[in-house]
Amino acid sequence: MAQESGINALGQFQLTTGFGAFGKAIEFTNSNEMMLLAAVIVTSLFVVALRQRALVPGRMQGLAEISYEFVHNMVLDTIGEEGKRFFPFVFTLFAFILIGNILGLFPYFFAFTSHIAITGALALFVFALSTLVGFWYHGIGFLKFFSPPGVPGWLLPLLIPIEIVSFLSRPISLSVRLFANITAGHVMWEVFAGFMLMLVSGLGAVGVVAAIIPLGLNIALTALEFLVAFLQAYVFAILTCLYLHDAIHMH
């Protein structure tokens, strides 16, 4: 029905082949291209911002310093002093996801964080890292993480499987949360925009007046999507910090 009426809200998530290399042996999709672009933007912004550091920072340097302090404080507050060694990873993850979310808000760009394969890969990497950190700090003693302290022995056969399932579900919840929020926002955006165009093309002058409502909703939704882009990057980063905290401190 949606496609018959001219609205294809899911078409924006379709993967298309862009350019290739080595005689098409390696092909880049629009998702790959946006990920490369996000990496280039993050790197370029900080290279330009910090190339000529001044005592009184300019706009670019100020933005870079605010971003640095924001993530640095988040890492220290969540993980503690041990978190300093993981700051580069968390900061890169936060910046990459944030820019990826924002890129998807512009016409002709693609939100690669709207694909579960991408968010799943990021979540699995975080899960693997936090697990390795746990064994690195505690060795085989990390398995005690699944045995909550102070629990009666007779309850352990029930609680340990629950703890294991909860632990293994972390990458699922982490990836689905980011994927679902970005996808839902873009679908609503497309539906309102399509509805507005249908009113204008189908009702003429009356449709132009009627389209004011979906236009206003689309403008409000656009502002909300920029906020969601930041919040989802923050949530992914803060949960990464929490998982690393659990691995280091065993609670």
UniProtKB/Swiss-Prot annotation:
GO terms for molecular function: proton-transporting ATP synthase activity, rotational mechanism. The chain crosses the membrane at residues 30-50, 86-106, 116-136, 145-165, 195-215, 219-239. It is found in: Cell inner membrane. CDD domains: ATP-synt_Fo_a_6 (cd00310). It comes from the Bacteria. Keywords: ATP synthesis, Cell inner membrane, Cell membrane, CF(0), Hydrogen ion transport, Ion transport, Membrane, Transmembrane, Transmembrane helix, Transport. GO terms for cellular component: plasma membrane; proton-transporting ATP synthase complex. PROSITE patterns: ATPASE_A (PS00449). It is a multi-pass membrane protein. InterPro entries: ATP_synth_F0_asu, ATP_synth_F0_asu_AS, ATP_synth_F0_asu_bact/mt, F0_ATP_A_sf. SUPFAM superfamilies: F1F0 ATP synthase subunit A. Gene3D superfamilies: ATP synthase, F0 complex, subunit A. Its main location: membrane. Key component of the proton channel; it plays a direct role in the translocation of protons across the membrane. F-type ATPases have 2 components, CF(1) - the catalytic core - and CF(0) - the membrane proton channel. CF(1) has five subunits: alpha(3), beta(3), gamma(1), delta(1), epsilon(1). CF(0) has three main subunits: a(1), b(2) and c(9-12). The alpha and beta chains form an alternating ring which encloses part of the gamma chain. CF(1) is attached to CF(0) by a central stalk formed by the gamma and epsilon chains, while a peripheral stalk is formed by the delta and b chains. Belongs to the ATPase A chain family. This is ATP synthase subunit a. The lineage of its organism: Bacteria, Pseudomonadati, Pseudomonadota, Alphaproteobacteria, Acetobacterales.
